[in-house]
Amino acid sequence: NLYQFKEMIRYTIP
């Protein structure tokens, strides 16, 4: 899921 991946990145780099 691309959504899950993007959510992980948004928490890594605000």
From Swiss-Prot:
Q: What is its main location?
A: secreted
> What are the record's GO terms for cellular component?
extracellular region
Task: Offer an example of a GO molecular function term for this protein.
Answer: phospholipase A2 activity
The record's remark on the cofactor is: Binds 1 Ca(2+) ion.
The signal peptide, as residue positions, is none
Q: Where in the cell is it found?
A: Secreted
Protein family according to the UniProt entry: Belongs to the phospholipase A2 family. Group I subfamily.
Q: What does this protein do?
A: Snake venom phospholipase A2 (PLA2) that inhibits neuromuscular transmission by blocking acetylcholine release from the nerve termini and exhibits indirect hemolytic activity against human erythrocytes. PLA2 catalyzes the calcium-dependent hydrolysis of the 2-acyl groups in 3-sn-phosphoglycerides.
Give the record's subunit note.
Answer: Heterodimer; disulfide-linked. The A chains have phospholipase A2 activity and the B chains show homology with the basic protease inhibitors.
| Name of this chain's protein | Basic phospholipase A2 T1-2 A chain
Q: Which organism is it from?
A: Bungarus candidus
Organism lineage reads as: Eukaryota, Metazoa, Chordata, Craniata, Vertebrata
